[in-house]
Amino acid sequence: AGEAPVLAQMQIGMLGIFADADQLVDLQKFVDEENYDMSDFMPGLLDASYYDGALVALPHSRSVPVLYYNKDRFKEAGLEEAPVTWDDLKADAKALTGNGSYGYSCPLDQWYYMSLVMNAGGTIFNETEDGIGFAGDPGTKPLYLWKEMIADGTMHVPSGQDYNSSEACRNAFAGGTAAMIQQSSAQLKGLEKTCEFEVGVGAVPQDTTLSYPAGGSNLLMFKGHSEEEEKAGWEFLKYMTNTENAVR
């Protein structure tokens, strides 16, 4: 107690709190010392590892919202591809609803809501980062989309909150009572193991823009440790984020 570890895996939403408190090591010094190649990191994920110009983390265990769909049910309904637009989503969900099954299921969760907000042209913060970026249509259109689909009986709202709601959503998919679900890309392997049908993966349908809020966690290094510990920590960070380990 009272002593931070050398390294930690941290949810990206918490990164700024510790960086603002000057608790994190700027990893750029290690990158510069050995001319470490950073090109293998996806730019969009790497951007979320910087705070006020300092490289305070490396991407690890990152994910984005995706649309999973039951390929068998799609074939039975005469559908060939995952829906691309919100209109496609509504039409496909209607075609897939019936016999005790909903066409679509999604937790009423802020992360999945924000994915629809961004696909409607909104952002979490405005350009000056002193207010929200989803006032007006980008913020309300996703809610009206959900409201319409729930009223039409084509959208299942899983019970519970947070992770419980997501688990209920995945159970509905695996059990055949939801043909499409919006979940994290991190759930792919688990769904492939539990579902007795072929699982398809598509982008979250868009309204005006194809854009998503990346989630997951980063690896970081805390200040307050010896030079030897920092160097050992850097070696472990490289090991954990190299291509071979990242794709496992």
Task: Locate predicted features.
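Glycine-centered hinge/linker elements that transmit conformational signals in sensory
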Residues: 92-96, 131-161
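Extracytoplasmic/periplasmic substrate-recognition and gating elements
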Residues: 76-77, 152-155, 192-248
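Conserved N-terminal structural module of periplasmic/extracytoplasmic solute-binding proteins
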Residues: 1-22, 31-39, 53, 81, ...
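Hinge/lid segment of periplasmic solute-binding proteins
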Residues: 12-66, 75, 84, 88-92, ...
